[in-house]
């Protein structure tokens, strides 16, 4: 049985009464726009469409950088931004430098700081955005394919040693890769609901780089219209729309529920799911 996904009426998401703006297909041809259903690419007919791509920080998980980290350094956010290296964090998220190098160059003046203390501060600050875990659970129960699509760095937790031991035990690359997100995983177990598939520290690219979005489509082997991308950063949402990915600007979970429901996503909770 073919799986179909109804394309929403574009105008419905552009009205002022819309919960939050969606950005479907700005550069797609008219014949694609008028197609009433989205089909999977060859070899993917058993997948439930659309595939859901979630940003992590401040979409699913609270980002401690804006409040907890400045407090850790005894600064305001403005002061921290002014004295930190302008590109160090970006290079860290792209996997160009590791956390040791980050700690060396984080501040413009080269001052040292307690790296483990910073990591502990961030661990404490991680929590699910209100209502998000319940939504993820429902989507998972309803058989949607869900992937992380995020700008996120590699925080090592004795990873070099653990990776080596993992290789000796014959684990796959993806199993080793999973260890790299241990700081969030240990606390929130995000992988119960999605796969840590598309992360800047592994791909070497960051949103809103168009090539990052194209890499995602290539790896998933689906057309752009078979994906929905959710992110709290408007520039990332707009960049996804530029390559034809249906995109939602995350503001809060209630509005996201309305948007997903309006787009035909099954967010119903059946009775046997409630008993899980």
Where are these regions (language model features)?
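Generic structural signal for small/hydrophobic residues in well-ordered secondary structure
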Residues: 55-58, 95, 148, 197, ...
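N-terminal chloroplast transit peptides
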Residues: 1-24
């Amino acid at each position: 049985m073919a799986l179909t996904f109804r394309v929403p009426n574009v105008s419905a998401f552009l009205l002022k009464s819309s919960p939050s703006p969606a950005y479907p297909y700005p550069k797609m041809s008219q014949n694609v726009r008028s197609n009433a259903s989205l089909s999977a690419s060859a070899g993917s007919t058993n997948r439930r469409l659309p595939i859901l791509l979630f940003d992590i920080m401040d979409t699913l998980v609270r980002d401690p950088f804006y409040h907890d980290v400045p407090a850790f350094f005894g600064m305001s956010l403005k002061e921290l931004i002014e004295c930190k290296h302008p590109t160090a964090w970006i290079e860290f998220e792209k996997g160009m430098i590791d956390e040791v190098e980050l700690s060396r160059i984080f501040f413009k003046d080269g001052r040292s700081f307690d790296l483990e203390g910073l990591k502990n501060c961030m661990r404490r600050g991680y929590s699910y955005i209100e209502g998000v875990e319940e939504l993820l659970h429902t989507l998972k129960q309803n058989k949607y394919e869900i992937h992380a699509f995020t700008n996120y760095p590699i925080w090592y937790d004795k990873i070099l040693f653990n990776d080596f031991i993992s290789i000796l035990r014959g684990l796959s690359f993806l199993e080793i890769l999973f260890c790299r997100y241990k700081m969030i995983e240990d606390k929130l177990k995000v992988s119960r609901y999605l796969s840590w598939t598309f992360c800047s520290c592994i791909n070497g690219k960051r949103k809103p780089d168009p090539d990052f979005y194209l890499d995602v489509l290539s790896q998933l082997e689906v057309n752009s219209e078979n994906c929905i991308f959710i992110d709290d950063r408007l520039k990332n949402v707009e960049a996804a729309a530029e390559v034809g990915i249906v995109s939602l600007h995350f503001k809060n979970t209630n509005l996201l529920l309305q948007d997903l429901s309006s787009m035909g996503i099954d967010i119903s909770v059946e009775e046997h799911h409630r008993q899980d």
